Amino acid sequence: SFQSPLLQDLFRAKDPSLSAAALAAYGGTLIAVSSIFNGLGRFFWGAVSDRIGRANAFRIMLATQLIVFAALIVTKNPIVFCLLICYVLLCYGGGFGTMPSFVNTVFGSTLMPAVYGAVLTAWSAAGIVGPQIIAAIKDRAPESAAAWSFAVSTGILAAGLLASLTLRDRTADIG
């Protein structure tokens, strides 16, 4: 995760006299707190999807994260940055927590194993390729790497939101 270095950069810009230890403590605290939100997201978004439907819950996660990532492009306030990152991790955990039931509800129990396998493979591939893309951006444009990374992520979220509009929850198991 590059949330800690980004937060440290924001604090350093705000107060250049902060020690490396203080900056590392701020970054470590964000990682610890945001991981709690990751865990809570599994329960929170599961409850939301039970109430409003799987596809609708994913649409809300995608749409709200699109807004959050757009805000991350321009935020300079470390506290606002932390709050936005915690929300992103709430949705990340929510994605993992609701994905099995989402796939089953949208694609049916017969297709569920194959589709869920493909989803997890894609998610894993993104976890490998995404940081490589961010590292390449950071190598080529270190001063604006965060903004570019958040902008690319915003575009990917927009594509996901548009794709989600083609899906619907099925009320009966078609499998």
What spans do the regions from the language model cover?
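A late C-terminal transmembrane helix in Major Facilitator Superfamily
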Residues: V106-R140
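Extracytoplasmic gate region of multi-pass secondary transporters
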Residues: S1-W45, P100, G130-I134
